[in-house]
Amino acid sequence: MITKLLTKVIGSRNDRTLRRLRKIVKEINNYEPTFEALSDEQLKAKTVEFRQRLEQGETLDQLLPEAFATVREASKRVYGMRHFDVQLIGGMVLNAGQIAEMRTGEGKTLTATLPAYLNALAGKGVHIVTVNDYLAKRDAETNRPLFEFLGMTVGINVPNMPHPAKKEAYQADILYGTNNEFGFDYLRDNMAFRNEDRVQRERFFAVVDEVDSILIDEARTPLIISGPAEDSSELYTRINALIPLLQKQDKEDSEEYRGDGHYTVDEKSKQVHLTETGQEFVEELMVKNGLMEEGDTLYSPTNISLLHHVNAALRAHVLFEKNVDYIVNEDGEVVIVDEHTGRTMPGRRWSEGLHQAVEAKEGVKIQNENQTLASITFQNYFRLYEKLSGMTGTADTEAFEFQSIYGLETVVIPTNKPMIRNDMPDVVYRTEAEKFAAIIEDIKARVEKGQPVLVGTVSIEKSELLSNALKKAKIKHNVLNAKFHEKEAEIVAEAGKPGSVTIATNMAGRGTDIVLGGSWQAKVESMANPTQEQIDEIKAEWKLVHDQVLESGGLHIIGTERHESRRIDNQLRGRSGRQGDAGSSRFYLSMEDSLLRIFTSDRMAALIQSGMEEGEAIESKMLSRSIEKAQRKVEGRNFDIRKQLLEYDDVANDQRKVVYELRDELMSVDDISDMIEHNRVDVLQGVIDEYIPPQSLEDMWDLEGLQERLKNDFDIDAPVKQWLEEDDKLYEEALREKVINTAVEVYKAKEEVVGAQVLRNFEKSVMLQTLDTLWKEHLAAMDHLRQGIHLRGYAQKNPKQEYKRESFELFEGLLETLKSDVVMILSKVRVQQQEEVERMEAQRRAQAEEAARRAQAQHASAQSQLADDSDEGHHQPVVRDERKVGRNEPCPCGSGKKYKQCHGQIN
């Protein structure tokens, strides 16, 4: 009560922020007459002046009013567009490292030019992050004339760019690119072997467009760079054939109830579990099909991988639906459909073998599983920036998450013109068929009066169902979903025309405004060299149509189902009523919708259905509250999942930082011989301790074992026994010293043969590649630890604490193994001449660079993450060109040794 009273008197935090920023807006506006009087050359010279003032000690905040006034004036001259005051406020919010919630159509692209220009003056580069390549290219090309007028360079960062072009793009003052590509470049840079192979510079300032999509919807999905693992495609096919034999059980087994089904489904958490009966039945099938020995169990250590395959196949059949969660394209590939946007995501693959299981289910070619080489979550990548900001039309519902995870405050920016869209209450029907019939009637009525309609659906399947119903009703319409997204811009351009009907999956088309009356720019662009007279004529025609649409009520939004997140619903509504235009929206629901079916209480459902007749709809405040409560519940659960992922990933992130800092150190110095020398002493002391325990009696020493170990692992001939026989006064410490000195002399002899510089390069190469190999294995070990750690809860242990403790032990082991492996490899490399070492070093580098080139940059799918809450992924294969040499096979070089004891040490 007191809080509400105080808010009324002094305003909310948002109101106070806006009041403070409006004072700076006045200051910017005061510069306008002065800047209007400047010539183009004088205006352009402002950039040089600002940079000089920064060097002299002024701050970016002190330059802000003049810099924003400069951009506004340049925009008037280049585009004939003047930034509104609310856009200046949005620009200041972004510059302060906050999130600006700006409604659709309020000009976010133009707003971003203000903080981008100001922060680019610092010379450290500004990254403007978008959700897809199309928007990155569009926004970069749209704003390029403005930035170049002011003397700034603009770059574009998209996949598959040649290395020199990408490196040059990162040197630009302002760089547009996708969230995936920025993250992958960071990972690739940390797999490079030379500084000149890196592309990124420091991460200074990022403006994230559609920040809710990138930092929240995709926060559970790690970016992964992966290479090929072993082939197990035949096993997927064989297990896939068994799954249709399993029967679903409606209720979980308990003390009172034991069903005869084989699996149960938990729709809320998107999980499927084998029952006890199911486990026994699957084991019988496995034995029959020769996949398991008689009397064996799925849960024995030797069969863990079989259990993994069964679970993946079961989830593929039960939880993942064609044309909802994925499509099969013309090339016979399973392509994931993004649950948030309805777009296809080529190149992304589900984790934990799920993608291969879906491929087996669909009978298409099964790609190999891949092994993670490097990974990072968006949460941890974007927290690397010195200053981070974002903009979106819908952030306020997630303000708490932005604040608690990223430390970003959300500021709601007022619209330039008052919002007059009419958001009508939800209507609820008993069945989906009744709901669709009502939607068709509503569309018919709107089309008759010339009002454009946008219908939002939750999946491709639903959009096609509705499309078929509209065809039967002879209503002309366009469908915008993952299957047709190459026509997206064209369909969106038509969506605002009188009487046009557009069905869009989720928020496909996001980032492109629906202009009432259609897009006159699209018509101009379709003409070859139009004259000014023709352009004016097109504009005049468009104005008439635009006014006609406004009179009919503006764009009408129909939602066919409530989403799990209120934010996605708000995004759909936000397509209408842009810049003070007329518009309306309504959601049509049925008791068969997944949100209502899963989250509405049985009592509420029975109460609603008992009093309803066929075709009858209800509008009820109680029901609306119940739906909102269900959405809040789901949002809370999803927030907890993301928070938990971050807590686990933070452990890996600390280790990632240590490994990447070590890599940076290795790459920035030419000579690591001191480090190698220090490691050699450490490793040899440890080996000697095993055979000559410190401060022990001579009778306890295993001198023969020590001699053999030194010879086998380090190629050192140290006749320790003979030394003792020759000098019985040789005490333990002196003996240790003698062994280490022998190792040093042997290594120095190698150095004299090949030359110091060549050996220095070889040491660095061995160290980097050994570190990369061990880090890759460590990631796999961390992944396995993460998957089973929740079971510690049954032993009354805290899974997170256990994960931290065990991952720390694993990491300590990695650092120790790194030392010993590098010392062993360098000790055992036998070289006769300089050319041999140079050839081997070149061979190692070529292999590593080839592996890096062929490694796949992947983004594990959000749907899989929700389903299994795992942390890593398996992805598209990289096909090996020749047969892999087994570790115990003879080495192909002809030395007569086993591969693992010869070139296997190098590779």
From Swiss-Prot:
Pfam families on file: P-loop_SecA, SEC-C, SecA_DEAD, SecA_PP_bind, SecA_SW
Basic and acidic residues: bias regions: 841-853, 872-887
Keywords annotated in UniProt: ATP-binding, Cell inner membrane, Cell membrane, Cytoplasm, Membrane, Metal-binding, Nucleotide-binding, Protein transport, Translocase, Translocation, Transport, Zinc
Binding site residues for Zn(2+): 891, 893, 902-903
Residues bound to ATP: 87, 105-109, 513
Cofactor: Zn(2+)
Reactions catalysed, as given in the entry: ATP + H2O + cellular proteinSide 1 = ADP + phosphate + cellular proteinSide 2
GO BP term, pick one: protein targeting
GO cellular component entries: cell envelope Sec protein transport complex; cytosol; plasma membrane
Biased amino acid composition, Low complexity: 854-865
UniProt GO MF annotations: ATP binding; metal ion binding; protein-exporting ATPase activity
Quaternary structure and partners: Monomer and homodimer. Part of the essential Sec protein translocation apparatus which comprises SecA, SecYEG and auxiliary proteins SecDF-YajC and YidC.
Functional description taken from the UniProt entry: Part of the Sec protein translocase complex. Interacts with the SecYEG preprotein conducting channel. Has a central role in coupling the hydrolysis of ATP to the transfer of proteins into and across the cell membrane, serving both as a receptor for the preprotein-SecB complex and as an ATP-driven molecular motor driving the stepwise translocation of polypeptide chains across the membrane.
The family this protein is said to belong to: Belongs to the SecA family.
Protein name listed in UniProt: Protein translocase subunit SecA
Gene: secA
